[in-house]
Amino acid sequence: MIEWTILSSLASALLAGGGTYLVYKKVSNANYKIHLEKAKARARAIEHEAEMILQEAKIRAKELEIGAKSKYENETSKVIKEYESYLIKLEKQEAKNQQRLERETQQLEEERRRINHKQASLSGMIEELEKLKGDYRSKLTESLEILSRVAGLTQEEAKELALAKATEESRAQIAQIVRKYESEAKEEGRKRANYILAQATTRFAGEFAAERLINVVNLPNDELKGRIIGKEGRNIKTLEMLSGVDVIIDDTPGAIVLSSFNLYRRAIATRTIEALVEDGRIQPARIEEVYKKVEQEFEEKVLEEGEGIVLDMELGYVHPELKKLIGRLKYRASYGQNALGHSLEVANLAGVIAGELGGDVKLAKRAGLLHDIGKALTHDFGGSHVDLGAEVCSRYKEHPVVINAIFAHHGHEEAKSIESAAVCAADALSAARPGARREVLESFLKRVQEIEKIAMEKLGVRQAYAINAGREVRVIVNADLINDEESVLLAQEIAKEIETKVQYPGEIKVSVIREVRAVEFAK
């Protein structure tokens, strides 16, 4: 009975296990099919995505191909245009060379005709001298015979007497011939010089604009005038002390005026005020910050301008410091004539004159551009612009012809070359043009420069600025070297020396400014 029960239980268990297995198998098969379908769907999705990526890649490749083709066409077109431009330049240069060749050929032909004319003249003179010699011999023989017959002289005595008389007559005739040909030579030289100067002045006509002593800064509104003045005048005092420029604020609507004989200071002050107006923040610390930034920008600007001029004139290598000084000539005037404009005019005229005389055109232009380079230094250093220019050009190993031209254009030396002589002639032409220079203005500028120089020579002086049309000089001293009592004595000393050395109308106010700043940082 028990065995039967066990067997029944085992059979039931087997039947139950088999049913469970069948159910599990069916479920597994169903899950497999589901997973299989999902896998197929994923595979189809991946395949579709791959097709999309491939399609996008083909489109992208097509776009890149089109872009590359377009870029290639653009670059090719650019190269073709550059080549065409280069060919045009070559053609123009060839035309210029051809014109120059024709002009030089014409000049050579004229020179050949002139030489032939001189040779013919010399041949005529030789024939005339031979004729004179023949006449002299015949007259000598005749005189000897007459003297021997009439005076009873020996032949030797008669010969000496006749020789003395013939020599005197010959000298007079020869002197007359020499004077004649000297006169012709001088006239020929004068005509040649006039021709060269005419060629130079007609081939180069420079513009001229007289420099002024003021700059006008336009303001968006008159409210800014009060902000520029600042509380108790602090802003305007800071600006005037930094720049050495007289800031004039009057009833003129929408404008203020900056006055100074120094164009460079005035230009920096003008740009500083324009930058402050654009920025809107106007107070002493900001004014100092903007002024230093503008000053640095101008240092870079003058170097760029100098480099551009040297490049345009094709002068080759020029020392960077000389380029900077060339750029600073733009902010320097002499007798109301802009120094850079004058130097460029002299350079071009000197090149033309040297070319006509058979000299080195490029060297003449170089000497002409640098002949007044010392004027860029006269505001900062004492002495003649000739000596300063020669010194700085010697320091930077300039050509001896350049240094000779610097000395020669003011008569300190004789011109030792065609190029130096061309610079001297060009300088005289540029300066002598009607209206090119103003003597009264130059005498005023020299006076205010002398006033500043007297103040700057004193121990402890950091800066000195002549303002108010030279009626006041502001002297900024080093507070560590000069105390308050010494400031009073310094003002008296400067005033006394100005009275002794400078001629001026009215009176000059000497203001010594001693500023002490204590700076500490909270950490």
From Swiss-Prot:
It is found in: Cell membrane. The keyword DNA-binding does not apply. The gene is rny. PANTHER family: RIBONUCLEASE Y. Residues 339-432 form the HD domain. It is an enzyme of class 3 (hydrolase). It comes from Wolinella succinogenes (strain ATCC 29543 / DSM 1740 / CCUG 13145 / JCM 31913 / LMG 7466 / NCTC 11488 / FDC 602W) (Vibrio succinogenes). The keyword Cell membrane applies. One of its GO terms (biological process) is mRNA catabolic process. InterPro entries: HD/PDEase_dom, HD_domain, HDIG_dom, KH_dom, KH_dom_type_1, KH_dom_type_1_sf, Ribonuclease_Y, RNase_Y_N. One of its GO terms (molecular function) is RNA binding. It comes from the Bacteria. Belongs to the RNase Y family. Endoribonuclease that initiates mRNA decay. This is Ribonuclease Y. SMART domains: HDc (SM00471), KH (SM00322). Keywords: Cell membrane, Endonuclease, Hydrolase, Membrane, Nuclease, RNA-binding, Transmembrane, Transmembrane helix. It is a single-pass membrane protein. Residues 213-279 form the KH domain. Its EC number is 3.1.-.-. GO terms for cellular component: plasma membrane. The chain crosses the membrane at residues 7-24. Pfam families: HD, KH_1, RNase_Y_N.
